[in-house]
Swiss-Prot record:
Span of domain BPL/LPL catalytic: 31-205
Organism of provenance: Vibrio cholerae serotype O1 (strain ATCC 39541 / Classical Ogawa 395 / O395)
Principal location listed in the UniProt entry: cytoplasm
Enzyme class, broadest EC rank: transferase
Gene3D superfamilies linked: Bira Bifunctional Protein, Domain 2 (3.30.930.10)
Protein name: Octanoyltransferase
Amino acid sequence: MENQLLVRRLGRQDYTPVWQAMHQFTDQRDSTTRDEVWLVEHNPVFTQGQAGKAEHLLNTGDIPVVQSDRGGQVTYHGPGQLVAYFLIDLRRKKLGVRELVTHIENLVIHTLKHYQIESAARPDAPGVYVQNRKICSLGLRIRKGCSFHGLALNIQMDLAPFLRINPCGYAGMEMIQLSDLHPVSMEQVEKVLIQELVTLLDYEQVEFSTEAYNHE
């Protein structure tokens, strides 16, 4: 199972049911469970991470706010943003948390390079940035030596809701999206992202599914 990966393409989903399913998957997995990556677009939602503060919610309006258990502070998810959840057995992969964060940042940097876009991580604020504007947010949780939660990469979306918050706790943090820099589709980016992940984390066997995780 160490080198096997299942990628679930879940389409457009509300945040809370997917979050609950990640918990169930992580609670029930054991040393024989293969790693999974879930690709999803969420309906509009603000999520507060464990370090989130109420004062960073400026004017949420009609968009719901969900208190999440991932690391980090507040962010926005919405249609046109690629969310990838990494359900990885870190002990089996012999990875530390910081190593996984670096791998995920590099995964996005390599994916953007595929489109001739130069980007970088920042030591003071996890995520990936293009010319100091944030294109990808990152937040993880580790339980039983396994990761869940993941990244949110802005592809082709309405960025206006980010103005209603201090993204990741930074007032005035400017956001950017891939379609501002290069014409691209969600499907193309998914494909490149998974190829880069397989290379970075050394998976040898990859299977794709459009079925949601069912814990029963």
